[in-house]
Amino acid sequence: MADQLTEEQIAEFKEAFSLFDKDGDGTITTKELGTVMRSLGQNPTEAELQDMINEVDADGNGTIDFPEFLTMMAKKMKDTDSEEEIREAFRVFDKDGNGYISAAELRHVMTNLGEKLTDEEVDEMIREADIDGDGQVNYEEFVQMMTAK
């Protein structure tokens, strides 16, 4: 799994790993994971942190080492860039199926997700993704937005 990563990606993940590994001992504990999650505005319980560690902790020693971290990141990357998932997400937004996401369609979906956005905010989201400037988002633009690093 991790052997499909580029050297650049591995270097980036090493940097991320170091942010988690506060004491620099080469492993991430539940305490260190909790610190980082809270700094990102999350509020995980001790049990949730333990579950997260257990999911990744291949050797069962209760902490995450760098190879385990790499495997997790490689899995996540494989999962997120799935062409089919992006196509499905596009279909959710493109209510009338015309191949474009309009401001009205975007507002509708965001409202259903519980996000009350102003017209300005919706227009801004469209503008950010709208590469050709036609005022709506086509599939190519949507893919660009979803896969932008």
From Swiss-Prot:
Chain positions recorded as Ca(2+) 4 binding sites: D130, D132, D134, Q136, E141
Keywords, alphabetical: Acetylation, Calcium, Metal-binding, Methylation, Repeat
Record-linked SMART domains: EFh
Residues that bind Ca(2+) 3: D94, D96, N98, Y100, E105
Residues with PTM N6,N6,N6-trimethyllysine: K116
Signal peptide residue numbers: none
Keyword Lipid biosynthesis annotated: no
Recorded GO CC terms: myosin II complex
Binding-site residues for Ca(2+) 1, renumbered to this chain: D21, D23, D25, T27, E32
Annotated function: Calmodulin acts as part of a calcium signal transduction pathway by mediating the control of a large number of enzymes, ion channels, aquaporins and other proteins through calcium-binding. Calcium-binding is required for the activation of calmodulin. Among the enzymes to be stimulated by the calmodulin-calcium complex are a number of protein kinases, such as myosin light-chain kinases and calmodulin-dependent protein kinase type II (CaMK2), and phosphatases.
Stated family: Belongs to the calmodulin family.
Protein's recorded name: Calmodulin
Taxon lineage: Eukaryota, Metazoa, Chordata, Craniata, Vertebrata
Gene this protein is translated from: calm
